[in-house]
Curated annotation (Swiss-Prot):
EC number: 6.1.1.21
Enzyme class label: ligase
NCBIfam families on file: hisS
InterPro entries xrefs: aa-tRNA-synth_II, aa-tRNA-synth_II/BPL/LPL, Anticodon-bd, Anticodon-bd_dom_sf, His-tRNA-ligase, HisRS-like_core, HisRS/HisZ, HisRS_anticodon
GO CC terms of this entry: cytoplasm
Family of this protein: Belongs to the class-II aminoacyl-tRNA synthetase family.
Keywords: Aminoacyl-tRNA synthetase, ATP-binding, Cytoplasm, Ligase, Nucleotide-binding, Protein biosynthesis
Reactions mediated catalytically: tRNA(His) + L-histidine + ATP = L-histidyl-tRNA(His) + AMP + diphosphate + H(+)
Gene that encodes it: hisS
Protein name: Histidine--tRNA ligase
BP GO annotations: histidyl-tRNA aminoacylation
Amino acid sequence: MSKASTFSAPKGVPDYVPPQSSEFVAVRDGLTRAARLAGYGHIELPIFEDTGLFARGVGESTDVVSKEMYTFADRGDRSVTLRPEGTAGVMRAVIEHGLDRGQLPVKLSYAGPFFRYERPQAGRYRQLQQVGVEAIGVDDPALDAEVIAIADAGFRGLGLDGFRLEITSLGDDTCRPQYRERLQEFLFALPLDEETRRRAEINPLRVLDDKRKEVREMTADAPLMLDHLSDTAKAHFDEVLAHLDALSVPYVVNPRMVRGLDYYTKTTFEFVHDGLGAQSGIGGGGRYDGLMAQLGGQPLSGIGFGLGVDRTVLALAAEGKTAGSTARCEVFGVPLGEEAKAKLVVIAQQLRAQGIRVDLAYGNRGVKGAMKAADRSGAALALVLGDRDIADGTVGIKNLATGDQESVSSADVVARVGAILGA
């Protein structure tokens, strides 16, 4: 009989299994905490959407739409796409559910997987995990600064400090057309290949985002948007920077920065960490004042970001840090017999009701095997219960770090464990 074939995860799609998954959850939750504190409500988005949403919203000239989307026909022969980013889906939901007709700004946050067909490398996956926020309906530099400060606080709250914020302005409808003409004039004078020239015709900023060395060298002297801002766009950008200064959020103005999505206007930013090498981005975002109208809604402004959970985990590792505990439990029960097991099951549930993570040695491991399992669990304490303890009405509490053990009354064990752990 032939051996059954085995399966593995698709290329570029990571599994997060214990104990590493504990850090993943801690990073994801840490990045969302600052948004909750600022009044951002949670939104849960579909994993797939109508392909046209991303083609229109993200931009057909982007690598995301032209090269990286997972697009397929469903059984009704409708073209659908696994979501490559979150903003377009949020805007669609805001329009569909009329959230834009209530109190403004609409503040929403989300977390989950997104999908792009990229060349897999460290922290750059085909299923990427992101945390994002969107603030829709108010064109206010103070709101731009708040969104940026939320991301900064999320990273710092995890203990990350080796990152920097790069920021620029991509202008507004007043100055962008003139800048576009000047940039195209510069680009069309270069010996560009046919595909790059096509990009320059659709959205010339995309050429400045080209990662190829020869293209970057040719465009080194390209005109910069920051030198062509309208008075209104410049005043907006200056005010954003003033708010960031007041919030003590450090930044570096990068006039050559171009984000990978076409909908950005005015304030645009990226968080980078040099410990990650060439793929240094850990998150970014910006303002997208024309996107809602482009998707059929009101002409309302918006600003948001997407932060990479996978890449933040790697950035912490580059600094020799971890987020949260990788221990799967705080207390491990070691029953010496079936009667002891029945009693520890009850005690475990009582401790869990107090918010304490508890596991037990199930099966017939024997005391040696059970204690070995306790050590491997990462727990701080072991509850040891045998026939003599049952007769005495006590439970043994063992400190797994020091080996010290004490006996307490069965009636007091929950309170005593809570006191030791500070729960």
